[in-house]
Amino acid sequence: MITTKITITPYLAEYIIGKYNHCNKGEVRIPDSSDLYHIIWEYMSRRPAEVPVLESGNLEIALPDRRAGKDPAVYNYLSVRAVKGIELHIKNMFNQELHSELMDNDRRGHFLDNIDVVHKFLCTYGIESISEDALLKNYYRYREALRQRKKRKQRREKLFNIS
């Protein structure tokens, strides 16, 4: 198995390690049913001659290895742009999963406080490098943006449905 190391935001690296490696250190093997697997596959390229092999990074990824197509022994380089794209996708995965848990809690009658839901989420994936308050603030911003979008949509419908 060919691996490569990349440097991303620490809490996102902890999230991926917790999600796919069950909080164990070492290389992370991403299942081929995941969108992230296919994104990494698309970004894999030949290592340029002037670029050295990096042995530093906070996330070690086992590169996708399919029967046909790119051989990871040759196509084992992820550029700076590729790392940014992978990090953005991981951040979207993280936010989508966290926000859906918080919204489910709201839909079910708000049995738990939001801070407790965030704490449970952080403990599930072994995330220690970001505070619960920061994630809660992120969720409140997201929720407010959804509410504003809904209001704009209702105003437009009201404006254009005048008969």
Give the label of every model feature segment.
Residues M1-A82:
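Long, low-complexity interaction regions most often at the N-terminus
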Residues S79-E87, Q148:
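Basic DNA-binding region of bZIP-type proteins
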Residues E87-G109:
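Positively charged, polyanion-binding regions of nucleic-acid-associated proteins
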Residues D104-Y125:
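Short, charged amphipathic recognition helices of the HTH superfamily
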Residues K120-L136:
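Short, basic interhelical loop/turn and adjoining N-cap
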Residues N138-K153:
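Short, basic alpha-helical nucleic acid-contact segments in DNA-binding proteins
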Residues K153-S163:
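Intrinsically disordered, low-complexity basic tails/linkers immediately adjacent to helix-turn-helix/homeobox/MYB/SANT
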